Amino acid sequence: MLPYPQIDPVAVALGPLKIHWYGLMYLIGIGGAWLLASRRLNRFDPTWSREKLSDLVFWLSMGVIVGGRLGYVLFYDLHAYLANPTLIFEVWKGGMSFHGGFIGVMLAALWFGKRNNKSFFELMDFVAPLVPIGLGAGRIGNFINAELWGKATDVPWAMVFPPFSDPAQLPRHPSQLYQFALEGVALFVILWLYSRKPRPTMAVSGMFALFYGIFRFIVEFVRVPDAQLGYIAFGWLTMGQLLCVPMIVGGLFLIWLAYNRKPTAKPAV
């Protein structure tokens, strides 16, 4: 069994002002995505300035934050937030939904593309290889918060999470780290390498949806579902898995469509 490295969720406290690691992970993810996007900016559109790229990253980040929070409220704990709506704004305590953030990003990309003469999939193919940076950083934030841990297990790398998070004090799968490895590291490597060569429009977006859906679906088998939801069907299906099914199907369809129509191949950057 490995010791859980207890880290204060508050990174910096300046009087009443508290800066949480969870929030810093979002900033790290957004900043890292911007840096890598700037490296591929000329391949995407030589006429774009760094300022326009910053605008894109800003609006997509707003889509992640607003969509992620509202997605968690709607998909995972609507009753509690209806009972106390002020809880919606306590984002430093966790409670973000990837699938909600994904919807938020798509809506932001649609809006930004129309204002800047870019198609939806041009933008999505550009940003898809950058998303795993934010996903990986977010999972580290979950780990520091000691939330979203896995089922009890006797594997050698099991961890006992703090009593405030897990009163049962059982050795558990560190599922946040599994998700960091798959959704952060593995997904980044797959998409970054795949997008280095010219790909048909929609192909990189399809690869993102497919592999994220697969990785998340797998990890959900060892992750404890949200207590207020539990398993929603068959005694094993979680909300996360249910939301991944359309991503997997949609990803396969986009890849098939990308390679079975006749667009001009562009660098998917």
Swiss-Prot record:
The job of this chain, per UniProt, is described as: Catalyzes the transfer of the diacylglyceryl group from phosphatidylglycerol to the sulfhydryl group of the N-terminal cysteine of a prolipoprotein, the first step in the formation of mature lipoproteins.
Q: What is an example of a GO molecular function annotated in this UniProt entry?
A: phosphatidylglycerol-prolipoprotein diacylglyceryl transferase activity
| Residue numbers binding a 1,2-diacyl-sn-glycero-3-phospho-(1'-sn-glycerol) | 139
| Position of the signal peptide | none
Q: Which organism is it from?
A: Pseudomonas putida (strain W619)
Source organism, top-level taxon: Bacteria
Q: Which GO terms describe its cellular component?
A: plasma membrane
Instruction: Specify the taxonomic lineage.
Output: Bacteria, Pseudomonadati, Pseudomonadota, Gammaproteobacteria, Pseudomonadales
Q: Which UniProt keywords apply?
A: Cell inner membrane, Cell membrane, Membrane, Transferase, Transmembrane, Transmembrane helix
The name this protein goes by in its record: Phosphatidylglycerol--prolipoprotein diacylglyceryl transferase
First-tier enzyme category under EC:
transferase
The way it spans or sits in the membrane comes to: Multi-pass membrane protein
Please report which protein family the annotation says this sequence is part of: Belongs to the Lgt family.
Where's it found, cell-wise? Answer: Cell inner membrane
**Pathway as given in its UniProt record:** Protein modification; lipoprotein biosynthesis (diacylglyceryl transfer)
Entry EC number(s): 2.5.1.145
Protein's GO biological process: lipoprotein biosynthetic process
- Membrane-crossing segments per the record: 17-37, 56-76, 92-112, 120-140, 174-194, 202-222, 237-257
